[in-house]
């Protein structure tokens, strides 16, 4: 895509021997020759065909996909990669190919879990390039299309292939992994196989500290659901020669150094020492590596072995074999006793030989013989041949290489067996980590095999790239012709052709015993002397050169024959097969063919060739994905980009070949809107225009076609969504566009100069007008000042005249008032004197009348007292007779009392029996009620009979009293005693009447309850309450009767003593009126007390059982009531208040054991199962938070309940105390007011209450999190659409951005309006359910923080979002959120607006004009103080102005940021530029309580449903 036509001032790329390509400006054009002034300062003269056009409008930070480059050529690709590498963007797409540049430093923010979550499900190319995107695309295609996939990772040593493979396997394991509960052993073993294989297959080379010395193909198998079901690891061509030969400054395999750094007990067990003392390790001066701890790696490797299924015994055996190889390498050989023989050189060699034999667990002498001798078997005899020193050393090295190779193969097979392969697997994803193309100063057999592999893969790669090009053209439905590409089949035939290929000749030479590398080279020279891809170097007799696709490579044939032979010495096979160690013996099994033939030749090249055929067959059945790893420099240091080195790797990796294939067709592809936006200035008249000048009716493809026809361009193609241009056509269009823009610039300059001149004229005219206005104003002010002075003089004169007249008037007024005052005072004093005289006369008359009236009253009072005394004496004597008759009634009442007690006990027992059997014996309940009713009627009849008997006895006593003559003159000896007896009798009568009344009430209640069968529980409770009251009344009556009886007895005795002097003794039987003496009494005091105590104990046991049953029923009723939405009262939840009042009344907080808390927790847990109903969740959040607040206030530390007064243990004592302590109505009302004023009172809580408080706190936090997460999920979909302005076509997008109206109903802000409405909806829901403001505030603060994180991270991950127009769009959306925060009170919004500080500052920076004038200090301290250097750097490098095409910040600012980032590169936290989401609970129970202290529950009303339940009467 060289330049065809250039003009002076055009920017081009020219070749440079130092930096490969350098840009410059054309300063002279002479035909086909041009002069270019380079940016380095030098001027070069070149042909036009040697220069390549430069895209001056390309973004400074490069593009994600190099197919989007305007000019797809080598310098453009190289510059794009270098620009991205400078801003730590190490990944770039070339179509579907990912190019990865090794940064040689840790970038943890690119590979954390958050980044992995970003790429899950994202479309390929939607986010920044990343290996996760390639792995996700492969996984999605596998699941959606049902086709197996493969990912090929290639690159030279040190390019980062192994690390990239780890990332791919990590992502695939996460995507296809099972849940933790199902066990994730397969994917864990796949991941942990990497450190094991690295320990035994990786080593330090000149180019890489952790170079893989083997090829690896990992097959990850998946089931139909896309879960990993198995895996297999295939390895290729382990570099066996490294075990014995190491060049400086390289190292041997890592496992040798790890073993030498093992714990002391392992070192002692295997007799190890410092690595410098072992021959296989001290050939190089490099023993230790920076940033690598061998001891730590040893421990990590052992752990990884445990995970992949290698048990501890097998691990011990593995490292025992590795230690044996080290000791074997220290065995040196000297001359033996016989000629041409060898033997261990000294005691040190004998020690290591003995140690190696002990570790191999074989015979020491047999090991020595296998190294120093060979047994030749002929037809008739067996000949033992001694080996010389050199041959013995080669035999030793051969044994070491064979043992290590067999050990490595065993580890790979063990890992495969442990992971397991799924025979029913539907699909697989293969990850190929293969060595890249190699060309060194000395290239041996390993480089030959490696380059053969790359030739095969390059052929597969070219075919895939060609297929992608065809798919792209077919997708866009354009006409295309066959595209030629370089086919390397001739090179492959040269190497691997069955008859006459290099591998065939090599195998043939290995079969001949006398063949050497000279004969092999001579055979190749003769066979391929005419082949165009094969040549012989001039200065060498045995070397040969092959022209590979990546360049010419010269191979040295000295060791080709030895390295191609793959056979085991018969003595070594026999020796180790007979080892006492089962593990060592299993490495060398004795095969049937080995028994027949002592040594069998097999070709490594043939086996490797067969492995490649199998690999390519597997790859051909899969959909390939390519990752090309690039090493930026050979120093292995960060921030260094060597152009020549990178360009060579791009050529070797086939990237340039892929670009060449693209250039052969249509290298430039632009979307319609991008093409019109860039080149619409060439032919604006071909577009249909509306009133505002933008396309209206014509579509973008028609506009593009008209534009290209207008400029007379040939060879282009119009697809469905893109314009396809031939090579060089983009440069031609750019040249024409620059001419149009130049003319437009001149026109703009002319208009601008005219504008400046007019502005100057208008300014001068305005200044003259202002000066005239100032002069006229000064003259007017002078005239106005004279007029104002005249008006002031007149005003002063008027005020003085008014003051004089007012002063004269006041003097006359005060004189008249003084005269009137004197006359009126004299008249008033005369009237006062007359009134005093009149009052004195009246006072004298009143005292006289008072004396006469008082005298008359005293006389009447004295007469009345005399009359009253006589009458009271008569009444006292009559009352005494009544008391005597009442004493006779005591015995009858006592009998009635005992009968009532029996009836009460029987009634109590029947009620309890009814309660137990009420669920399954409804008929029995009716019978029991009838029995109770009949019992009550019988008791009432008995009471009436007792009462009638009492009346008869009273009448009889009256008749007897009438027959006995009583002297009227007997005086009352003790008046106080009579009054006391009278009062006691009155109380007794009142108690009897109250008992009668209560019995009547009980009868009425039973009659009412019998009509309602559904309310059986309430009937039992009220009946039992009535019975308890009856028992109390009966006991009270019993005590009062005993007291009255004793007092009547004393009074009767006194009366009889007083009347004995006048009346004859009359014998009266004690049984006639029911009165007995103390000895004959049927119930004395002790018996009554014992009987009462027994009844009390039985009653208490029954009462406890009854209370437990009733409490369970009450809890069920409470839960059935509050589980429904019973609303709010005075802005507070009724359910929480009702629950708290019940818990407080039932004393559940002070109980050691109770089930009420468990049932409440279960009720709350089942109520919030519907996680998506925010209305329901808000209701329960309000209730749980309020209940938690009330419990928090009650269970405060240091709270002590009121001390209880001691309760008497005696039944009669408790009854008496109840009568004595019964509160008056005033006291009752005062207590009620105190209780209402203090609903929440402190209690001492036990463990169940404290546990319930913790569980309630957890539910508050859970419901809070559910509402918050529901809101986040609702906003998630809208946020993904709010980060980028809608863009359907060029005209439409430009119109929307140039529109001056930004009302809320505009279509670009629909998604922001959705967020606005969603916030209002959740706020109204929370307010309607009276959720505490502190919880609402925290919900919105965390939601705004979530919005900030999502928008800011999307801004940093997607370059198309970092534009000027998109910044304006996001800023308008943020204005809506600010409007919402302003409309919402601070009580609910809080600091929500401050949570958007990152996205606000980022968007504010994006919409600033003339960013190139802003310094770094202004950005970091004034504009964006909250953003880190990494975040600012990424925004500045990703930003591009799609509206005005202005520049971003200056290069000095970018350089300053880069220096600061380099200084912080070692800090993992500082290098992370993405924000993390905060999902913690931002409040505690104390915070909730402190915010709700002002709530008053004094006038709260409980649930209406419970008010009708008598058991909850305490709520009213």
UniProtKB/Swiss-Prot annotation:
The keyword DNA damage does not apply. The keyword NADP does not apply. GO terms for biological process: actin filament organization; actin filament-based movement. Residues 494-528, 530-553, 588-612, 612-634 are annotated as: Actin-binding. It comes from the Eukaryota. Homodimer. Myosin heavy chain that is required for the cell cycle-regulated transport of various organelles and proteins for their segregation. Functions by binding with its tail domain to receptor proteins on organelles and exerting force with its N-terminal motor domain against actin filaments, thereby transporting its cargo along polarized actin cables. IQ domain mediates interaction with calmodulin. The tail domain is a globular cargo-binding domain. Belongs to the TRAFAC class myosin-kinesin ATPase superfamily. Myosin family. Plant myosin class XI subfamily. This is Myosin-14. The gene is XI-H.
